[in-house]
């Protein structure tokens, strides 16, 4: 409930309504206008307006209306003493500021000290949807408030499903940070008291607030009940931290620390550390389980660090460090992993830690980096190649002495290191010259030629002796020609979709392309292999394809709006004039697979991406990858992901959310490994969404691993949320899609 004390200050927005300056008054048709110094005129209208010069008192009776700017006050009666600056209004008092509303029977306020009271008050704050009542609300000092017999809810119903009540609450020193003291707070659910405290105290601040986080409760059939709690500590304006104390049943206690900082706008980062002494491991080290060649010990941990920083002269530094004590940690505690790290661990089967920095100019770029890889498929990384370091320099395409010729440059120095196996230093220099032109103002033509020089100095393990520098030179040349056809359609041609996305015109473009690429055969068998740079294949091939685009022009163009690409389809193929290609089945073919990419971006209702490679000899796909998200106006969602690489990967994943009867959602996820013929994980649940609260439950079923080293595990947890107040538990990510 951080910052909820701010609602009390809204009781006193009326203090901004007036100041001790002359008024504009209207009695019938008569009016007098006098301008205030700061906020414009105060306008008073009433059936009867009286001014007593002796007491310097204005009295207004009957349909009183007082207004200044977007603030307005209505009442049956009002009185302002211009000497004491006391304002009193009574009888059906209604105060508005924008969409915020205060109703009360009586208000008393000193417009100079801005201290006062309101009685029998009802308050509505639009932004937070707060409905507040109080028998008496009082501002008794600077940043000092008191509310008696009050209630709070975010429900719009006259009989709210839930509410908080309090006998008295007092808040002090809001601006500097202080304490709120509540007497007799009670939480009601459908008029039934379910939680009572005789007394409570809470810190109040205008900025971030330290305190305990609401705990999360769950259950695992393998390890028993789970209770996850934490403490948030905002110890500086530019730094904060969260401490986690989780009880994971038979596993025992798991601790965590997350530290966040933002020293400047361009220097910020986050560090996370987690530790558990896993009690499920046997007491005897000789009996520790071995999974995929790794021994799982008692003490298990992980840390993840992200950092970015800018230096003078536009130099920058970024880092992303990921480390786990054992690879099984990625499965047992995957909720600890940052989202990008989780994707790498599942798809690329590796954890990557990288630190890089450099500088970008208009026409050049300099990048230096170190990269360390943790291969999660291997028990040891002794033979895994690490880049320590790699320095790259790029010259972007630019004219040569303002001629039609352009040049660009790709260059790098890399040092490859590992505990076991060949190490090497490599220098790579690749300058290129290109000549772009237009033929008959219809065809786009570009030819290019480049010379690539690569130097190696290898070190043999274990003696670390060098075989001296070795070199490889090769030529890369090519040409490409393309054109573009297009047709423009009026938005009324596709009326429904044009109105839905507010598009005035559509443009369909077709871009056929043909190109040629040549690189001679070079002797490189004796050179080490670390990445794609180390093996440049003999190339003598023609490439042809076609690209289609669907572009929409918005009805109203603003500063940031413009033509938007809603869809794109690319189809391409290579034909070898030299060595044949080798397909997934190991056969030699002169025609490559037909590659294709398709994506649609009709968000929020439909977004899809598809890519694949079709073998033209078997007329079957060697690879297919599909990702689609569909949503309707009822907020139903379907997410489908399918991956198929012949002989290596075959999986399908579903995430869905369906609205049944009005407030009830059903949701689920299902991940299936088609290659192994077994399901991987299933998540099912339901959520009830009322206007001001929601509640749900989640059942998670994790299947055993294909090698049977991990047994099946089932988890269950519930969550509950009060609108704009807080939540207990954690809802699945796809409920927020």
Q: Where do the model's predicted regions map?
A:
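Bacterial Sec-dependent signal peptides at the C-terminal "C-region" and cleavage site
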Residues: 17-29
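Outer-membrane beta-barrel proteins and related beta-barrel translocases across Gram-negative bacteria
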Residues: 100, 106-116, 123-153, 157-167, ...
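Charged (often Lys/Glu-rich) extended helix/loop segments that serve as interaction or gating elements
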Residues: 26-153
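Bacterial N-terminal signal peptides that target proteins for export
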Residues: 1-9
């Amino acid at each position: 409930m951080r910052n909820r004390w701010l609602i009390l200050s809204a009781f006193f927005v009326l203090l901004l309504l007036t100041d001790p300056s002359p008024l504009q008054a209207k009695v019938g048709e008569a009016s007098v206008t006098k301008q205030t110094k700061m906020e414009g005129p105060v306008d008073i209208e009433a059936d009867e307006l009286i001014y007593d010069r002796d007491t310097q008192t204005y009295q207004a009776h009957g349909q009183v209306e007082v207004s200044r700017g977007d603030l307005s006050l209505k009442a049956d009666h009002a009185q302002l003493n211009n000497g004491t600056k006391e304002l009193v209004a009574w009888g059906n008092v209604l105060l508005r500021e924008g969409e915020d509303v205060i109703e009360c029977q009586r208000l008393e306020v000193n417009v100079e000290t801005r201290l006062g009271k309101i009685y029998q008050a009802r308050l509505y704050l639009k932004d937070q949807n707060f409905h507040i009542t109080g028998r008496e609300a009082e501002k008794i000092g600077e940043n000092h408030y008191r509310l008696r017999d009050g209630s709070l809810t975010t429900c719009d119903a006259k009989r709210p499903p839930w509410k908080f009540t309090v006998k008295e609450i007092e808040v002090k020193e809001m601006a500097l940070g202080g304490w709120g003291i509540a007497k007799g707070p009670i939480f009601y659910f459908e008029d039934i008291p379910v939680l009572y405290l005789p007394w409570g105290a809470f810190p109040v601040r205008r900025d971030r607030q330290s305190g305990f986080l609401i705990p999360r409760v769950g259950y695992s059939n393998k390890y028993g009940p789970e209770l996850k709690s934490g403490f948030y500590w905002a110890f500086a304006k530019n730094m904060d931290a969260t401490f986690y104390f989780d009880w994971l049943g038979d596993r025992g206690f798991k601790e965590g620390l997350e530290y966040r900082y933002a020293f400047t706008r361009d220097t910020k980062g986050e560090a996370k550390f987690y530790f558990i002494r896993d009690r499920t491991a046997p007491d005897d080290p000789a009996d520790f389980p071995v999974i995929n060649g790794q021994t799982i010990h008692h003490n298990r941990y992980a840390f993840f660090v992200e950092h970015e920083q800018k230096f003078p002269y536009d130099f920058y530094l970024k880092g992303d460090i990921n480390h786990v004590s054992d690879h099984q940690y990625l499965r047992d505690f995957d909720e600890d992993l940052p989202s990008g790290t989780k994707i790498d661990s599942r798809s690329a089967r590796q954890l990557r830690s990288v630190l890089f920095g450099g500088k970008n100019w208009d026409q050049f770029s300099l990048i230096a980096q170190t990269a360390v890889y943790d291969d999660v498929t291997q028990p040891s990384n002794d033979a895994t190649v690490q880049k320590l370091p790699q320095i790259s320099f790029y010259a972007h395409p630019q004219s040569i002495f303002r001629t039609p010729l352009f040049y660009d440059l790709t260059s790098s120095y890399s040092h490859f290191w590992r505990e076991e196996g060949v190490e090497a230093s490599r220098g790579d220099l690749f300058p290129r010259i290109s000549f772009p032109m237009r033929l008959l103002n219809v065809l786009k033509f570009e030819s290019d030629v480049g010379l690539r020089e690569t130097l190696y100095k290898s070190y043999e393990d274990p003696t670390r002796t060098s075989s001296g520098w070795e070199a490889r030179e090769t030529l890369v040349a090519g040409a490409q020609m393309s054109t573009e056809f297009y047709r423009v359609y009026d938005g009324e041609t596709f009326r429904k979709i044009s109105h839905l996305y507010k598009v005035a015109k559509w443009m369909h473009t077709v871009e056929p392309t043909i190109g040629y690429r040549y690189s001679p055969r070079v002797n490189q068998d004796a050179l080490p292999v670390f990445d794609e740079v180390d093996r440049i294949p003999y190339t003598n091939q023609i490439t042809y394809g076609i690209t289609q685009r669907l572009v929409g022009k918005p009805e109203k163009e603003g500063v940031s709006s413009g033509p938007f690409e809603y869809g794109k389809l690319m189809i391409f193929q290579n034909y070898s004039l030299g060595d044949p290609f080798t397909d997934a089945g190991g056969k030699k073919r002169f025609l490559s697979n037909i590659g294709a990419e398709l994506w649609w971006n009709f968000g929020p209702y439909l977004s899809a991406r598809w890519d694949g490679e079709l073998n033209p000899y078997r007329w079957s796909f060697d690879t297919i990858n599909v990702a689609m998200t569909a949503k309707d106006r009822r907020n139903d969602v379907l997410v489908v992901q399918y991956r198929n690489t012949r002989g290596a990967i075959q999986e399908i994943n579903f995430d869905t959310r369906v609205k049944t009867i009005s407030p009830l959602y059903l949701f689920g996820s299902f991940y299936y490994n088609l290659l192994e013929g077994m399901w991987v994980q299933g998540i099912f649940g339901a959520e009830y969404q009322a206007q001001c609260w929601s509640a749900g439950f989640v059942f998670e079923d994790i299947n055993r691993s294909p090698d049977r080293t991990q047994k099946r595990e089932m988890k269950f947890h519930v969550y509950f949320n009060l609108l704009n107040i807080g939540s207990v538990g954690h809802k699945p990510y796809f409920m927020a899609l």
